[in-house]
UniProtKB/Swiss-Prot annotation:
Alphabetically ordered keywords of this record: DNA damage, DNA repair, Hydrolase
Key word Hydrolase present: yes
Domain of life: Bacteria
Keyword hit for NADP: no
Broadest EC class assigned to this enzyme: hydrolase
Listed InterPro entries: Formyl_transferase-like_C_sf (IPR011034), MPG (IPR003180), MPG_sf (IPR036995)
Gene Ontology MF term list: alkylbase DNA N-glycosylase activity; DNA binding
Name of this protein: Putative 3-methyladenine DNA glycosylase
Taxonomic source organism: Psychrobacter cryohalolentis (strain ATCC BAA-1226 / DSM 17306 / VKM B-2378 / K5)
Amino acid sequence: MLASQVVSSVVKPSWFARPTCVVAADLIGKVLCRELTDSDGQQKILRMRISETEAYIGEGDAACHAHAGTRTPRTEIMYHIGGVFYVYLTYGIHHMLNLVSGPTESPEAVLIRAGFLIEGSARLMNEQLLDVNRQLNHIKQLAGPGKLTKGLQIDRTLYGKPITPASKVWVEDDGCQPLVSLRPRIGIDYAGDAKEWLLRYIWTDHPSLSKK
């Protein structure tokens, strides 16, 4: 089938209500879409194919914000049924994009760690950015959750919104199914044994990864 014949479908919020580890693995190869308005008032859609995710699996996961039932105003959205966004700020600088997953009252989510732009999106994004030093011409420009949200202009205004086109951020499926490998999660040395759990899902050997 020619690339022009590939048909994408919008992933429905109910898709995210499945087990979190399944969602995290199945997101590899999916397309994260971001609708933006340029300086001329024109709408554009940036598309990033997801190459790396991490699963956070609830109160028994010491790396999860809701570990041991830590239910706070910030983490409340994690108790929602899968299909909404959980975005938070880390180190006072970087926004982290999480897709809430699993059943209601089970605080779980998938962190989007890395991806790469497709279908002319690099050109569209560079038109959006006036500073040539910020232009996204390299395969690793979205390699890392902070770089990713900065590049796609995602912040906490997305918190709690449904994962649908109405929120201007959504996921599409065009049938891409790459080989997926499992690795330990990154940056969670505080999490005891949980830091060794194989809950980071990567597109095997893809150059866009934040870490192989």
